Amino acid sequence: TYAVASLDLMSYDIDQGTFENLTLLILFATMVVIALLFVAFRNVKGVLFPVISLNVALIFTYGFLNILGIKFTALEVAVAPLVLGLGIDYAIHLQRSFACHRNNTDDVAEAWMRACGKLSVPLSLAVVTTVAAFLANLVSPLPPLSTFGIALAFGVICAFLTSTLLIGALHVTFNAGAISTERK
């Protein structure tokens, strides 16, 4: 018997096994995110808006990789749970701050803007440092690691933007007529 082994064959097997688990991995990460959001907010909007936002961030991230013509490998599969895990943090902080400001005003848009204003510096610094850390992979001699760094950096930026813009827009759109329950 003869055995053939090469890096290309091993990479192919690893990629195939990983792709088969992609759906399960994303579903598990999403379920963990939903559980954390439910514990944090205990209402449908508090859970649904960040989930929508993070899924849009993932669509943008993987779409960006596709537009660049980047070959989808096992490392890119790991982008989804990492972006979900990092992005949920932005959503939780913003929604907590929004809830505090919502108790002081009937204007939903004003409450969201105050929340964003209060957290703009700390969240921006968190995003910048995280993106810089992921972009450090660009100096790697291994092309898949460079691609992984680009994907994660772009994913974090997308998660931040969708958390600040999309979640805010959803709150303004679907809470416009509501008055804060604690102010009634």
Go through the PLM ranges and name each one.
Residues 2-184:
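Membrane-embedded transmembrane helical bundles of large multi-pass transporters/channels
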